[in-house]
Swiss-Prot record:
Family per similarity comment: Belongs to the universal ribosomal protein uS12 family.
Organism of derivation: Nitrosospira multiformis (strain ATCC 25196 / NCIMB 11849 / C 71)
GO molecular function, one term: tRNA binding
Record's protein name: Small ribosomal subunit protein uS12
Oligomeric and partner information: Part of the 30S ribosomal subunit. Contacts proteins S8 and S17. May interact with IF1 in the 30S initiation complex.
Gene Ontology biological process terms in this record: translation
Basic residues bias: start-end ranges: 9-18, 113-125
Purpose of the protein: With S4 and S5 plays an important role in translational accuracy. Interacts with and stabilizes bases of the 16S rRNA that are involved in tRNA selection in the A site and with the mRNA backbone. Located at the interface of the 30S and 50S subunits, it traverses the body of the 30S subunit contacting proteins on the other side and probably holding the rRNA structure together. The combined cluster of proteins S8, S12 and S17 appears to hold together the shoulder and platform of the 30S subunit.
Region (Disordered): 1-30, 103-125
Gene (name only): rpsL
Lineage start: Bacteria, Pseudomonadati, Pseudomonadota, Betaproteobacteria, Nitrosomonadales
Any GO CC annotation of this UniProt entry: small ribosomal subunit
In-chain residues carrying the UniProt-annotated modification 3-methylthioaspartic acid: 89
Length: 125
C-alpha cells in the first residue's frame, strides 16, 4: 500500500473503461453490408428463431447484428445501418440493425412503438 507522499507524487491511475461496442469506434451508428442472413436459437430457458445478420462494416469489422420486428427484407449484399445494443439471450450478438434506414424496410402494419421500427404513421380514415 502506498504512502500519502507517494500518492501525492503519483496519483492512482483509473482503469480504462472497455467499450461494449468496439466495432462502432465512438460513432453512434455504422454502415455495413450483410454477408449472411440467418436464424439462430436463444440460450435456455428461451425458445425461438431469432433473425440475425452477419455484417461487414465500413471500418473492416465483421459483426453479428440482430434484426428486430416482425418480418424483414434483408438478404446477402443488403446495405444496413447498425447501432449498439446487445441481445441478452443470443451470445455474441452485440449490435442491432436500424429498421427503416438504407436497405432495411420498416415493420409493416406497426401501430405502437413505431419509431423503433422505422414505421410511418398510418393514414387515419
Amino acid at each position: 500500500m502506498p504512502t500519502i507522499s507517494q500518492l501525492v507524487r503519483k496519483p492512482r491511475a483509473a482503469k480504462p473503461l472497455k467499450s461494449k461496442v468496439p466495432a462502432l469506434g465512438n460513432s453512434p451508428q455504422k454502415r455495413g453490408v450483410c454477408t449472411r442472413v440467418y436464424t439462430t436459437t436463444p440460450k435456455k430457458p428461451n425458445s425461438a428463431l431469432r433473425k440475425v445478420a452477419r455484417v461487414r462494416l465500413t471500418n473492416g469489422f465483421e459483426v453479428s447484428s440482430y434484426i428486430g420486428g416482425e418480418g424483414h427484407n434483408l438478404q446477402e449484399h443488403s446495405v444496413v445501418l447498425i447501432r449498439g445494443g446487445r441481445v441478452k439471450d443470443l451470445p455474441g450478438v452485440r449490435y442491432h440493425t436500424v429498421r427503416g434506414s438504407l436497405d432495411t424496410a420498416g415493420v409493416k402494419d406497426r401501430k405502437q412503438g413505431r419509431s423503433k421500427y422505422g414505421a410511418k404513421k398510418p393514414k387515419s380514415a
